Amino acid sequence: MALWRSSDNLVYLPPTPVSKVLSTDDYVTRTNIYYYAGTSRLLTVGHPYFPIPKSSTNKADVPKVSAFQYRVFRVRLPDPNKFGLPDARIYNPDAERLVWACTGVEVGRGQPLGVGLSGHPLYNKLDDTENSNIAHGDIGQDSRDNISLDNKQTQLCIVGCTPPMGEHWGKGTPCRQNTQQGDCPPLELITAPIQDGDMVDTGFGAMDFAVLQANKSDVPLDICQSTCKYPDYLGMAAEPYGDSMFFYLRKEQLFARHFFNRAGVAGDTIPETLYIKGQGNGRDVIGSAVYSPTPSGSMISSEAQLFNKPYWLRRAQGHNNGICWANQLFVTVVDTTRSTNMTLCVSTDSSATYDASKFKEYLRHGEEYDLQFIFQLCKVTLTPDIMAYLHTMNNSLLEDWNFGLTLPPSTSLEDTYRFISSSAITCQKDASPTTKEDPYAKLNFWEVDLKDRFSLDLSQFPLGRKFLMQLGVGARSSVSVRKRPASTTRGSSAAKRKRAKK
């Protein structure tokens, strides 16, 4: 006899609805007022491989300045709500607030194109595995050699209103406790903000070389004790509010120039099922199978330059369509096509004959930048829904606009100390801070202040003229070409000539 029974499957419940993230175009109203802002010539000079400390202190006397470093500019903008506007009727200060929208940017780069070499005087190179004539496993105590190379070629520009995020491989936490000295450490993908001076991926991977390479000779000098970061494009593209990356420009290229293997004891033994043992001629013990190429960025040409040209932001990749929250903008730049390292030579003696020991050689690298922007004045209508949304997105935004949460007065008697930082009283941990803290105070950026560099005269600046030409409102020529009117007597004169022939 057949009996009906209910299904054993679990009941499907719909997922919890996700709170909708609004685009800035939904609550930001754009005006027809545009401003130009630009920096002066920004210069930096230093040693391309390492900082040079002072003899008395650990403070760097000559900083490390390399073309393979990130340049992260933190651009400070004036508060538009305290700005001298051409028309005070643009917005209602009781119900609206003004913000800046970045609509155009141009990153200018000076200095000629050039290739700067990197390397290590004690590079971990065992054999040339591309043109090897013998396979052996005899490894001496020290087979390091002086090797130089041209790194991977990278051009990069990221624009956003929060610092860009980078990723790299670091040392993770092992699950088992009985680890021994010499065991391979676990790897962990670490995400952290990209700061000014961080090293880019030069072709050896994005990783913490100071922790993961103990011999200090597997990579060139400029990164052997540094962390190379790669922009976390996936994370920034998936960011809910789209603040860290409005848009980005990227060009990378490299190829493997030389092929080496590493000296050292193989931590991972090759399984015997993968080869047949040899006899004699050094093949009874196989050599190192830890192969490593030296990268090369190949040819540099002015035809493939991302810089010194304007870019117009019409639609950002995220929900933030170019609005500069907190009146700041972060511009991240990498340009390895101008990586020339200048060699300086100073003589220590006035000898008439050449003696190499009488000359000192120095290395320096210099960089030149110029930032230009077009900002559009926008306004936000402060309805209760929009204020609640902005508070959820950034709780300090309303405080900057002089909106605070007023608590109801307390009916109980509370204690208020006069000197809250005094050692004579109990620690006042719950006391509110006297001054607002910068959320990026512990991060290193190249500070650029544009509070005094805004101008409405767009036609007086290079990027402003390009922007006006894009809008079709550029200055037209005052010389007009007038066409000569057609003659009205041509037909009658022709008829007269015909009659005259008769």
UniProtKB/Swiss-Prot annotation:
Region (Disordered): 480-502
InterPro entries: Capsid_L1_Papillomavir (IPR002210), Capsid_L1_sf_Papillomavir (IPR036973), dsDNA_vir_gr_I_capsid (IPR011222)
Main localization category: virion
GO cellular component, one term: T=7 icosahedral viral capsid
Transmembrane segments: none
The keyword Coiled coil belongs to this UniProt entry's keyword annotation: no
Record-level Gene Ontology MF annotations: structural molecule activity
Keywords (A to Z) from UniProt: Capsid protein, Disulfide bond, Host nucleus, Host-virus interaction, Late protein, T=7 icosahedral capsid protein, Viral attachment to host cell, Viral penetration into host cytoplasm, Virion, Virus endocytosis by host, Virus entry into host cell
Subcellular location: Virion; Host nucleus
Coiled-coil region(s): none
GO BP terms in the entry: endocytosis involved in viral entry into host cell; virion attachment to host cell
Function (record text): Forms an icosahedral capsid with a T=7 symmetry and a 50 nm diameter. The capsid is composed of 72 pentamers linked to each other by disulfide bonds and associated with L2 proteins. Binds to heparan sulfate proteoglycans on cell surface of basal layer keratinocytes to provide initial virion attachment. This binding mediates a conformational change in the virus capsid that facilitates efficient infection. The virion enters the host cell via endocytosis. During virus trafficking, L1 protein dissociates from the viral DNA and the genomic DNA is released to the host nucleus.
Similarity annotation: Belongs to the papillomaviridae L1 protein family.
Subunit structure: Self-assembles into homopentamers. The capsid has an icosahedral symmetry and consists of 72 capsomers, with each capsomer being a pentamer of L1. Interacts with the minor capsid protein L2; this interaction is necessary for viral genome encapsidation. Interacts with protein E2; this interaction enhances E2-dependent replication and transcription activation.
UniProt protein name: Major capsid protein L1
Organism: Human papillomavirus 28
The organism's taxonomic lineage, starting at the top: Viruses, Monodnaviria, Shotokuvirae, Cossaviricota, Papovaviricetes
Originating gene: L1
